[in-house]
Amino acid sequence: MGESGSGKTTAMRNLPSKETFYIDCDKKGLNWKGWKKEYNVENKNYWSTDSFSVVSSLMDKVDKQENFQHIKYLVIDTLNGLMVAEKMRILAMQSGDKRSAWSDLAQNGWALINKALTLRDDLTVIILCHSETISDDNGIIKTRIKTNGRKLEKLVLESKMTTVIWSVRQDGKYKFILSADGSTCKVPMGSFDTDECDNDIMIVIKALEDY
């Protein structure tokens, strides 16, 4: 998780493109030189969509289809891109049950996280999210995954995740925060000796190989 411009997408730069399927839910492309040669429809490792149903279908394909078994990393960038797009579609509804549609938004977000937990064991799912820093009724400040809708806020998406990393830019340097008071970031016990590391998802994946 991280604010816009904190290096979330850039942190994916060292993933092996031949073993990675990238779902671009923000529809803005990736942000390192030469990415279009690595990730494209022709290579069957890139798709741009802001539809929950399409993302769910792609997850099923990567998980089960024989011609996708070489894929070891699945990136969803970002969950917020899906939620915001769905929110805009609901707001544009001229008819229908908007209350039900808002419930569907929360259900779709929760279902996507749950589906990620059920995919094959040799597939690492990386879900990028925006972060927000809020103050609760007691004045306690916390940084967490930004969600759309009160139902998802109450559910706490991080509770379904084994690892939550906070991408930040401090003093001109991009890095990952692995553990910090007042945040929901977390890594398995013993996986790191420090509370931060370089902005590179492969460092995290390597550290988690035994978990």
Can you annotate each of these PLM segments?
Residues 1-75, 80-81:
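Conserved P-loop
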Residues 125-198:
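Phosphate-binding/switch region of NTP-binding enzymes
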Residues 33, 86-87, 171:
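Hydrophobic alpha-helical membrane-insertion segments
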Residues 11-14, 65, 116-119, 154-158, ...:
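A general structural signal for short secondary-structure junctions and capping/turn motifs
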Residues 194-211:
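Charged phosphate-binding loop/patch that engages nucleotide di/tri-phosphates or the phosphate backbone
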Residues 73-155:
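P-loop NTPase motor core
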Residues 17-20, 120-123, 159-163:
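Short glycine-/polar-rich loops that comprise or flank the Walker A/P-loop
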